[in-house]
Amino acid sequence: VYKRQLPAGERPPCDFNLISRYFYNCPAEDASHTIDAETTADLDLNAVFERIDRTTSKVGQQCLYARIRTLRGQEDAEAFGRSTDCFSRNGELAASCTESLSRLTDEDAYGLQNLIFDTPAKVRYFAWVYPLTLLAVATLLAAPFYPLSLLLFMAIFAVNLYIHYSNKLNVSLYGSAVKQLSLALRTARELAVEEVPGTEEATGQIRQVAEVERRSRVVGTQGDSANELAAIAWLFIELAKVAFNIEVILFQRFIGSITARRDAIHGMFRFIGETDAAISVARLRSETQTCRPQFVDGKYLKAEQVVHPLIDGCVPNTLVLDGTGLLLTGSNMSGKTTFIRTLVLNALTAETLDICFAGSYTAPYMRLLSSIRISDDIAEGTSYYLQDVS
């Protein structure tokens, strides 16, 4: 079912500068809590992510990373668990979706989220574009009757040439993102045909993104230098684009369509990413001893046979807290901090991925904070206490 996947140890190293970009850009308005950089470091969360990541696409990788650092409440975790169940029960569906998701494995796919969050490029000198285009058409039509109008046309062409190539960089910058948008649209359509979880909401978003994709075809179009006839044809097309500002006008419309439909692009992005993340967790369940968490009200925690996902051959531990706290003591190097990390990591995966690395896990849905890797700094005049409370 997952033949396209590599075992975790054989997968290429994660580039967290690219993977985390979506998490840092995405507004967390619907989140009850996000895992900050300090807690991420305390829990070795990036290393944990590398161990549990089974995603196929770069979009899925970004969404899985954002999910594991964003707590959106018990209902969201349980809904994600139901999506995971869907792929756990239906291996053929998971395999078919994995095939579709494999289109978005190129590193350029990390840049798809730029279309959602980046400030749109501004077309330079756009106020002059329509008047110059009308003048170019008028002088060309007048040429058979007033040949001298060709001189005016050449002057206008020179100005349009400057405008055209002044904006060429903006057009080229969108080239790879537009290619990934087309691939993502095709992927989303195929996932929708399979009626994976989230299809009903995504259908309208896919339709809106298709309108953006149609307007994006002007971006990144280049001539075929390997074919002389094609190169000649492309040259004449390029001259027409320059003379009548065709590329500049279409690019402006493309930017406008992206701005107007960012929510739809984001919705489609999440539809693809959440599907990939759910398949990833389904695969993780099939490979690793895990359980489904039970969320309860009140001050009660029971974790049986809980282990740390980064430690091979980890000795399981059991903890029950019923209305009480815990003071953990022991000698140096006895595993106190590792045990704390184990509990917090399992609480985190329970509240974000609806799985735990344990025999059973019962606890309330709660905020997660840590302060483990702190130190004093004489040069900056900070003590352990100040670092802890700041």
What is the meaning of each model-derived region?
Residues K179, Q387-S390:
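A general alpha-helical scaffold signature found inside nucleotide-binding enzyme cores
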Residues S370-D388:
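Flexible beta-alpha connector loops of hexameric P-loop NTPases
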Residues K3-S331, F339-V344, A350-L368:
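Alpha-helical coupling/stalk and coiled-coil linker elements that connect catalytic or binding modules
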